[in-house]
Regions:
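Short, basic alpha-helical nucleic acid-contact segments in DNA-binding proteins
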Residues: 69-83, 88
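DNA-recognition alpha helix
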Residues: 45-56
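Single, function-defining residue in the core of a domain
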Residues: 1-42, 50, 80-82, 92-97, ...
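Major-groove recognition helix of helix-turn-helix-like DNA-binding domains
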Residues: 59-72
Length: 390
């Protein structure tokens, strides 16, 4: 029996509970693709073939099987992944769910639009769409249904905070989040955004002078000049360390905490790095079809969820030091899970039989270095607050 058969059987048990498979063979192929991705560490159908345990003798047979799966119109990505991620979030608990939306360009030809759930310094995919589009900027109409689909997958009654970068700063989005989905939001906006203050001439965010360490909080104002929207709240600051300017719009009253909350958005960029240069090497893929790429993202999403949960369980079981050389946690949960799976293959360890994410507070937050942690505590701000609420 191949060493990978144990992982195959465990994934078959975890993923096979869903009744959405049009053909159970589609599930079997998907599992071998996930195993190939984890074991090879890269996107390569040819490199995945060596890890398959089946009656087929030739590598080309496995490669063709994977390729057919990626281009099979019967493989409905969201219908297959929805029950998996819904079950993964079902035991989240009472903690706030932080969702992050972002885009990633592939070969300057395809745009991957994704909504992920923030999880302990990284992010796990919830829903996505791949379109042929030569820009990372997309209109609200393009991703509106993606947000609606995400809403259906979350636990009923969950408190949600949504975050996105400047490319998503649209009043249509803000209204949709508040009125249709019932989510809170923190969105970074551009410095040319118009701010309307009662009794004052409309001005742009760039007109507010900010020295290093200055922060301005504007509560209850309106934004945009042509079609005023609000009331919203704004947080403006110039970072005393990086010297960067930050402009955040929120549906809730802003404070210095708003900047820390928005900073969590960068966890999705770490997720994209895990899929690209820092992990699975997505950009090495030879797939050049939006629909096939979306199916490939399903393979990535399941691998990410599986490894992250394995890492979560490793820490919870008190076994982190078996796979992490740092005194304090220095690796992501995905990386810890990846190392644990290697131990399963080569040292006879056992997999943890779950795909559920825990919303509990991280008891072992990652520390890049003591110097980095200390530097983040050196930020000091001088805050001015203005309220325009009627």
């Amino acid at each position: 029996m191949a060493k990978t058969s144990h992982i195959y059987n465990e994934l078959l048990q975890l993923l096979g509970q869903s009744k959405t498979w049009a053909d159970i063979r589609h599930l079997h192929t998907l599992i071998w693709m996930v195993i190939g991705l984890i074991c090879s560490g890269c996107i390569s159908l040819t490199k995945w073939t060596i890890y398959v345990d089946s009656r087929a003798k030739f590598a080309q047979s496995h490669q063709r099987r994977f390729s057919r799966w990626l281009h099979n119109p019967r493989i409905n990505v969201q219908r297959l992944y929805s029950p998996i991620i819904q079950a993964a979030l079902s035991k989240w608990g009472s903690q706030e769910i932080v969702l992050i939306e972002d885009t990633s360009m592939l070969w300057n030809r395809y745009c991957l639009i994704r909504v992920s759930v923030r999880y302990r310094g990284r992010a796990v995919p919830v829903a996505w769409r791949v379109i042929e589009h030569k820009s990372s900027s997309v209109s609200f109409d393009v991703y509106e249904q993606l947000l609606r689909r995400t809403w259906r997958l979350l636990p009923i009654g969950a408190r949600v905070r949504f975050m996105a970068d400047r490319g998503f700063a649209d009043t249509k989005l803000m209204q949709y989040l508040e009125q249709d989905l019932g989510w809170h939001y923190r969105l970074r906006v551009k410095n040319d955004l118009w701010v309307l203050q009662p009794g004052k001439t409309p001005c742009q965010l760039r007109d507010f002078h900010l020295n290093l360490g200055d922060a301005i909080l504007l509560q209850g104002g309106k934004i945009t000049k042509s079609n005023p929207y609000g009331q919203v709240n704004l947080a403006l600051a110039r970072d005393p360390i990086s010297r960067e300017l930050w402009y955040i719009v929120s549906d809730e009253p802003t404070s210095l905490q708003t900047f820390r909350e928005y900073g969590e958005r960068f966890d999705i960029e770490e997720e994209f790095l895990d899929e690209k240069s820092n992990g699975f090497q997505l950009e090495q893929s030879l797939v050049r079809s939006p629909i096939a790429l979306s199916r490939l993202c399903l393979v990535l999403a399941i691998a990410t969820l599986f490894l992250t949960v394995q890492g979560q369980q490793v820490v919870q079981a008190g076994k982190r030091r078996l796979v992490d050389c740092h005194t304090f946690r220095g690796n992501s949960y995905l990386r810890l899970g990846w190392e644990w799976v290697k131990g399963v293959l080569y040292r006879g360890w056992r997999l943890f039989p779950t795909l559920c994410l825990s919303g509990a507070v991280d008891q072992e937050p990652a520390i890049a270095s003591k110097k980095h942690a200390q530097k983040s505590l050196e930020r000091e701000f001088q805050v001015r607050t203005f309220s325009f609420a009627s």
